[in-house]
């Protein structure tokens, strides 16, 4: 597995859970002897939903809600088989979406 790179992309609505998960991944990879670059914060995606407050009329009265999706990127350079095995066994919170590319 020499000169390979694992790219891990994390997404979550809560940035605290996201940072805790990123630290767990970095700590696990460093313990197994791999070189880690990150966590790199990526731009936060903000989605705004505008709805009418009233049911039938009063179009001027609206309410806005937003959803923020926080993202982090972690690169693991030259991972060992032990690194891959320990990352597979890692237990992360359910609010974090993980994409792994080899």
From Swiss-Prot:
Entry keyword Ribonucleoprotein: yes
Family annotation (SUPFAM superfamilies): Ribosomal protein S10
Source species, domain of life: Bacteria
Molecular functions per Gene Ontology: structural constituent of ribosome; tRNA binding
Pfam annotation, one family: Ribosomal_S10
Gene Ontology CC terms, in alphabetical order: ribonucleoprotein complex; ribosome
Gene Ontology biological process terms from the UniProt entry: translation
Keywords: Ribonucleoprotein, Ribosomal protein
UniProt xrefs under InterPro entries: Ribosomal_uS10, Ribosomal_uS10_CS, Ribosomal_uS10_dom, Ribosomal_uS10_dom_sf
Coiled coil regions in record: none
Disulfide partners: none
Claim: Transcription regulation is one of the keywords in the record: no
Subunit annotation: Part of the 30S ribosomal subunit.
Similarity remark: Belongs to the universal ribosomal protein uS10 family.
Function statement: Involved in the binding of tRNA to the ribosomes.
HAMAP family documented for this protein: Ribosomal_uS10
Protein name as it appears in the record: Small ribosomal subunit protein uS10
Organism: Bacillus thuringiensis (strain Al Hakam)
Name of the gene: rpsJ
């Amino acid at each position: 597995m020499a000169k390979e790179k694992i790219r891990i992309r994390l997404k979550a609505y809560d940035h605290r859970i996201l940072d805790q998960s990123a630290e767990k991944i970095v700590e696990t990879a460093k313990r197994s002897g791999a070189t880690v670059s990150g966590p790199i914060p990526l731009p936060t995606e903000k989605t705004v939903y505008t709805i009418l407050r009233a049911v039938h009329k009063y179009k001027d009265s609206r309410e806005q809600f937003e959803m923020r999706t926080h993202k982090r990127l972690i690169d693991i350079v030259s991972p060992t088989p032990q690194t891959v095995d320990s990352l597979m066994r890692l237990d992360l919170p359910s609010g974090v979406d993980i994409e792994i590319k080899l």
